[in-house]
Amino acid sequence: MSKTTSLALIAALSAGGGAALTATMYSFRSQKQPTAPTTTTSLTSSSSVPVPSTQVFTNPNAPLPPALAAPSPPLPGSVPGSPVNPAGLFEYGFPGPVADLASRHALISSYDRRTRNPHWVVEHITPASLAQRGGDRKHSAFVEDTSIPEKFQAKLKDYYRSGYDRGHQVPAADCKWSQKAMDDTFYLSNMCPQVGDGFNRDYWAHFEDFCRRLTTRYPSVRIVTGPLYLPKRDPVDGKWYTKYEVIGNPPNVAVPTHFYKVIFAEDGKVGGNVAIGAFVMPNAPIPNEKPLSDFEMPLEAVERAAGIEFATKLAPQRRKRLCTETSCAIVVKEYADRQKSFGKGGSQSRSPSP
């Protein structure tokens, strides 16, 4: 995908997407060969991860894939024959960047120390996991993630009177199968500042419900969710600028301009088809009348915007487009009704976020 094409897509994303652009661009397929990433990770893992009794897909107790479980890659050394040795700095410590990976009962997350938000959070839902009711939101509380070095943590006080919800990336309603799973969704490393009315408590919540309803058709649905910080063209000078608020005192947590979800709906067969849907929404009020298809984007556009590749090992012949396989449409539910159905408990300093 060219930079010109990417800028055009980013412009569409900044404006809230568009069905015509989506239809035009979705047929694009990148021919670029994947390259092996070089990252530094810090890993937090749950000691025991129960599996819903009728779950037959991926066992969360299985070892993490090598890409997640491997230690830091070998540090670069000096070039033979060079009169200088920049690698000598690493004797004092390697600067990173570091992605704090957490493997918990309900999710796996990668945390961005610079923005104090996750890069991405992955979840897996099935008809069996959603049918169980072992967890209740009223027994959960928002908590700071102490597995992250203190100076890089998002803090509860950062959100206090900020005007933003503590927006779940993996929603609590997806993790009712145990209280521990429910509790795992309340770490601040699973949160981003989200606009409440019109977004987190409305359109975004309807979108999360759409993801859950996919399990009526697909036996296994995997979802990766995360924030974006997209540039916007200045109408005066025509240049692109990335601008976002930072909440907290002192400023600590970045407020994303947009959020993405990439959905992998599996047919349940070994080597079977996977219906992929990639969506980007602005962190702003969205009318409930807005078609969900307006926010569908090519996977490659989301990857370029996020700096992340989601499906390098998924063969093209196994990929299907989610919104041609099933109807991509939200069902509007009032916020008060969702509170009752989700089992939400007492109030805090602000309305709890979905």
Q: Positions of the model-derived regions?
A:
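Domain-level detector for secreted/extracellular nuclease and nuclease-toxin modules, and
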Residues: 2-354
